[in-house]
Structures are given as structure tokens and as C-alpha cells.
């Protein structure tokens, strides 16, 4: 079960798509790298994407609003 920051319900399909994108990113990082990416490095890379993910969630929120979903604005977490 994925934790979504902010008081908003994002449809499962959107979460699945986002998760697939993260998996593809991880896979690409592995195949592009000449060296073995250590677990901690992978975590560091993932958390470097934190701001990107916030933007993604904000954009998804806007999209859902345009589609007529009753959503509240996302509150960026520290």
C-alpha cells in the first residue's frame, strides 16, 4: 500500500503508473551504470527525486481537478 502525502485520494491507476515510472527509472539507473549501485546510493537517488515527485503529485492533482474530481490542494511536506 502506497502512502500519498497530502489530503487527497489519487486513483490506484495513477499510483500504479507512477510506481512503474519509478521502477523504470531504477532499472535504467542500473543498466546505465558501469558500477554496481549500492543500496544506499539507490536510496539517495530516490530521495533526490523527492521534489520531482512533489511536482508530479501537484500536476496529477491539477489534472484530477480538471477532470472533475473533488480534490483538495496538496500541502508540500517538509
Swiss-Prot record:
It comes from Triticum aestivum (Wheat). Its cofactor is pyridoxal 5'-phosphate. This is Serine--glyoxylate aminotransferase. GO terms for cellular component: peroxisome. The keyword Cell cycle does not apply. Belongs to the class-V pyridoxal-phosphate-dependent aminotransferase family. Its EC number is 2.6.1.45, 2.6.1.44. Keywords: Aminotransferase, Peroxisome, Pyridoxal phosphate, Transferase. One of its GO terms (molecular function) is alanine-glyoxylate transaminase activity.
Amino acid at each position: 500500500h502506497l502512502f500519498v502525502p497530502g489530503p487527497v485520494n489519487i486513483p490506484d491507476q495513477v499510483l500504479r503508473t507512477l510506481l512503474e515510472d519509478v521502477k523504470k527509472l531504477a532499472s535504467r539507473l542500473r543498466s546505465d551504470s558501469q558500477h554496481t549501485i549500492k543500496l544506499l546510493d539507490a536510496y539517495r537517488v530516490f530521495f533526490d527525486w523527492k521534489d520531482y515527485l512533489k511536482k508530479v503529485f501537484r500536476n496529477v492533482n491539477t489534472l484530477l481537478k480538471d477532470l472533475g474530481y473533488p480534490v483538495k490542494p496538496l500541502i508540500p511536506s517538509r
